[in-house]
Amino acid sequence: MSKESNKAQEPQIEETEAVAVETEVVEDAASLMDELTQANFRVEELEQALAAAEAKVEEQKDSVIRAAAEVENVRRRAAIDVEKAHKFALEKFANELLPVIDNMERALQGTSSEDEATKAIYEGVELTLKTFTSAVAKFGLTQVDPQGEAFNPDHHQAIGMQPSEEFPANTVMMVMQKGYMLNERLLRPAMVMVSQGGASVDTQA
């Protein structure tokens, strides 16, 4: 083959090689784009799965929080119910004790420590009453004995009013029956006689 013929074929060979290289590059690029597309799809799938998992975790966390709150509410309501039941039972029991205390106080009023015939009885009842009131005080039962105090309609029940030079107006001048508080709540008001103050002056005399 002549040199001229070889030279004529060289551009064709180079062009063919260039086309082959370009084709290979295009195919590689296409393959790479396909891999990138698949990778993007996979990333999206993983992101969706992660979002779903996070949502599930939040849902479960919220359920746990609600369950814990409900348990706490049930525990609180149970504690309140127990406290109410305890107070009601104690209040009922205390109301049953009040007549016993009243009777012992009347027994003391009907006897005298100065009278030898009743001195032993007086001292025995007095000691019993003192011990009894001290015992019930441990459970929150306290007396309302407002002798000489200002009349308080929240704790006292007036059974009458009388003029008095000794006591100012609206002052408890006599306690007919002591009242009682149970854990700072009124159990029974004190029955009292209230002073009207000094007798009015007759200006026409």
Swiss-Prot record:
| CDD domains registered for this protein in UniProt | GrpE
**What subcellular locations does the record give?**
Cytoplasm
Q: Name one GO biological process term.
A: protein folding
* SUPFAM superfamilies given in the database record: Coiled-coil domain of nucleotide exchange factor GrpE (SSF58014), Head domain of nucleotide exchange factor GrpE (SSF51064)
In terms of NCBIfam families, this protein maps to: PRK14139.1, PRK14140.1, PRK14150.1
* HAMAP family associated with the record: GrpE
Protein purpose: Participates actively in the response to hyperosmotic and heat shock by preventing the aggregation of stress-denatured proteins, in association with DnaK and GrpE. It is the nucleotide exchange factor for DnaK and may function as a thermosensor. Unfolded proteins bind initially to DnaJ; upon interaction with the DnaJ-bound protein, DnaK hydrolyzes its bound ATP, resulting in the formation of a stable complex. GrpE releases ADP from DnaK; ATP binding to DnaK triggers the release of the substrate protein, thus completing the reaction cycle.
Assembly mode? Homodimer.
Sequence similarity: Belongs to the GrpE family.
Q: What is this protein called?
A: Protein GrpE
